[in-house]
């Protein structure tokens, strides 16, 4: 029985050490999450203003086009950018993103070129014999604009050269610390629909229409105050390229926020489980100790009875 109590005490000590580690990791992830979440919020106005500028150009110059908006045909392979973490200990975050991308690719495995962002994505798809053509690893917790710019320039070049005919992006859209939703979006070729105003603006347009005002005419009057130098096409080209980089930057920021949220949640669950285990082990220890004491008392009483 004494051996049993020693073993239980050893297990309690081991679990308690693990709990201290998971608690520390939870606190670190929470601190990183707050900063990552703030960066996501700070980036949204910039991307929204750029989207509005592109929409104004496309709405004003009805016939304008750009190579990034032109289809390359159905026979070319597709490019697929997949973003996840370099490290684990973040619950199901990595595997959920990878499975979402694999599900989207489906039976087009042979005709899909994968751009892996993060070690988990690279390893996951290489082990399954997917065509991983490039990889971007060791992404910082607070990414700079350099990585998305490198990825965007490489992808745009492949698209322009006809190496790939379309490009998809899979990443975990950050909603809150508990929820990270894997999404897949087509980012090349771009379409005018991608730059339409969000639902809030559409609802406002509906209200305007109910007031007997034509939103199309209103938008047209608003667009007339804009003049583009040297031309609308040149401005559009620069904006589309910048928007591509901004899209990847936002996706990377959301991926990092999702990673930290998932890690914080996973470490909190691990800490809670450790506390539950310590309670159970402590109860077992007390029962074992009580049993040992009872046994000793019985032995003393038996010895006293035998001595009479």
Swiss-Prot record:
UniProt keyword list: ATP synthesis, Cell membrane, CF(1), Hydrogen ion transport, Ion transport, Membrane, Transport
UniProt GO BP: proton motive force-driven plasma membrane ATP synthesis
Coiled-coil parts of chain: none
PROSITE patterns: ATPASE_GAMMA
Taxonomic superkingdom: Bacteria
Gene3D superfamilies associated with the record: 3.40.1380.10, ATP synthase, gamma subunit, helix hairpin domain (1.10.287.80)
Pfam families for this protein: ATP-synt
GO annotation, cellular component aspect: plasma membrane; proton-transporting ATP synthase complex
A GO molecular-function annotation: proton-transporting ATP synthase activity, rotational mechanism
Main localization, broad class: membrane
Keyword Transcription: no
Protein location: Cell membrane
Membrane topology annotation: Peripheral membrane protein
Family: Belongs to the ATPase gamma chain family.
PANTHER family linked to this entry: ATP SYNTHASE GAMMA CHAIN, ATP SYNTHASE SUBUNIT GAMMA, MITOCHONDRIAL
Function: Produces ATP from ADP in the presence of a proton gradient across the membrane. The gamma chain is believed to be important in regulating ATPase activity and the flow of protons through the CF(0) complex.
Subunit structure: F-type ATPases have 2 components, CF(1) - the catalytic core - and CF(0) - the membrane proton channel. CF(1) has five subunits: alpha(3), beta(3), gamma(1), delta(1), epsilon(1). CF(0) has three main subunits: a, b and c.
The protein's name in its UniProt record: ATP synthase gamma chain
């Amino acid at each position: 029985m004494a051996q049993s109590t020693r073993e239980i005490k050893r297990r309690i000590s081991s679990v308690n050490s693990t709990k201290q580690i998971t608690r520390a990791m939870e606190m670190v992830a929470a601190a990183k999450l707050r900063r990552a979440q703030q960066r996501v919020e700070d980036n949204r106005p910039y991307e929204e203003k750029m989207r509005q500028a592109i929409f104004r150009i496309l709405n004003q110059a009805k016939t304008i086009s750009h190579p990034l908006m032109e289809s390359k045909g159905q026979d070319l392979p597709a490019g697929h950018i997949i973003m996840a973490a370099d490290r684990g200990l973040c619950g199901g975050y990595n595997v959920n993103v990878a499975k979402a991308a694999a599900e989207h690719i489906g039976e087009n495995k042979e005709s899909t070129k994968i751009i892996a962002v993060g070690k988990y994505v690279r390893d996951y798809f290489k082990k399954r014999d997917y065509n991983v053509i490039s990889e971007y690893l060791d992404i910082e917790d607070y990414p700079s604009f350099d990585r998305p710019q490198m990825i965007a320039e490489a992808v745009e070049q492949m698209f322009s050269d006809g190496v790939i005919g379309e490009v998809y992006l899979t990443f975990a859209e950050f909603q809150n610390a508990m929820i990270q939703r894997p999404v897949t979006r087509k980012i090349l070729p771009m379409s005018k629909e991608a730059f339409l105003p969000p639902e809030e603006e559409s609802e406002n347009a509906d209200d305007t229409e109910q007031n007997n005002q034509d939103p199309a005419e209103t938008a047209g009057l608003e667009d007339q105050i804009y003049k583009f130098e040297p031309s609308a096409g040149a401005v559009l080209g620069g904006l589309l390229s910048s928007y591509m980089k901004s899209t990847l930057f936002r996706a990377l920021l959301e991926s990092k926020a999702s990673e930290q949220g998932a890690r914080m949640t996973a470490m909190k669950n691990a800490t809670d489980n450790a506390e539950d285990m310590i309670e159970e082990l402590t109860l077992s220890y007390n029962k074992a100790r009580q049993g040992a004491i009872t046994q000793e008392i019985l032995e003393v009483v038996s010895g006293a009875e035998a001595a009479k």
